[in-house]
Amino acid sequence: AYVPTDGNGKRAAVLSVHGHWPWARVDPVPHARALGLVKLGYFVLAVDAFGAGERAIEPARGTYHGALLGASTWPVGTPLLGLQIYDNMRAVDYMTSRPEVDGDKLAITGASGGGNQSMNAGAWDERFKAVIPVCSVGTYDAYIGAACCVCEVLPDGLAIAEEGEILALVAPRALMVINATRDGHQFSVGEAEKSIARARPIFELNDAGKRLKHAVFDSGHDYSKPMREAMYGWLARWLRGEGDGSPIPEPEIKLEEVDTLRCFPDNVRPKSFTLMPAFVHEQAKKKLARAPRPDHRERWEAEALMMKTRLEQRIFGGFPRGVDWKVEPAEKSEGQDTREETFILYPEPGMPVPGVLVRG
C-alpha cells in the first residue's frame, strides 16, 4: 500500500493492477503510477495477480501465470479471468477497511493485462467510481489468432457479449479508455473504437455521455508518463470533483529498487500461502466430492444423460443435429493399376472438405 503523508482524513483511493511486466506489481511501469498517485494525495493499493510476481510458483523476474499454468484452472470451472475479478473485489474490501480511504471515491487502473483486469473488475464491482483500462481495450473478435494470455480470455465470451457490452456495464460511472497508436492489433485504436461505439449509447441512455472518454497516444504498448498524466486529470474530475478532466502534470517521482518493494524479500512465504496448483487441486477435491454416486442402474442412466447433455453444451460447444450433408464429384482419372475420383464433401453447409477416392 502507498499511503500519503500530507495530513489525516479519508481520501480517494486507487487499486493499481499490473499487466505482464517482468516484475509484476513492483515493476517500474506500475510502480511509477503508484508513486505519482500517492504524491497527488491518493491512497494506492498495488496487488500481484494470482500466479504472478510474489504469487508465482517461484518468485523471480519474468514470472508468467498464463499458458498451461493459467489454463489449469479451467477444468475446475474457475477461469483465471474470473479469479482475477474476484481477487480485485476482495482488494476493494481491504481498501474500504482502511481508515485513510473514502469508500465512495474508488478507482481502478492498469495496462495490458492490468487494463483487462481494470475493465472486468470495473464492470462487475460498482464500488469503482472511475475505471481506466490502458493499452488493453480492443474487441474479442480481434483476440482470435492473437497471442493473448489466458487471463485475458473470456471463455464462451462471444456467445454472450462483445467487449463493448463489458465496457457498457461501467455506465453511468466514469470510464476513460487509453490506447496507443503502435500497439498490437487486438489492442489497437481501431478495434477500441468499435467497442467504445457499442458502449457509448448505453452511457447516453444513463445521461453519462460525458463520463466516457477515449484518449489516444502516439506510443507503443505502455503506461507512459503522458498516459499517467491523463489518468491523474480524469481521476481528479470524477473522484474529487476537481478540474475538467484535462491532464495533470506528474509530480517528481523517484523509483525505488525492486527488492525494497517486496512483501517477502527473501522469498520465504507463510505456510498458509496458496499457489495456483494447490488451489486447483483443492477445488478439484471439493467438486469431485459432490459428484453423484448412483446406487442402481436406472439412476446412473439418468445421471449419465444429464452429464452428457451438460458436457456437450457447456464444455464441447454443442454438436450439430439434423444437418444435411452432400458429396459433389469433381474429377475422375485412370492410371495403369488404379482409378482416382476427387470429390468435395460438405458435412455442413458452407464447409467444403476435399477428398480423393483411390480404387486399385
Regions found by a protein language model. Give the residues of each.
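Mobile cap/lid helix-loop segments that gate and shape the active-site cleft of serine hydrolases
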Residues: 74-75, 83, 128-172, 180-196, ...
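Cap/lid segment of the alpha/beta-hydrolase catalytic domain
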Residues: 9-100, 137-149, 360
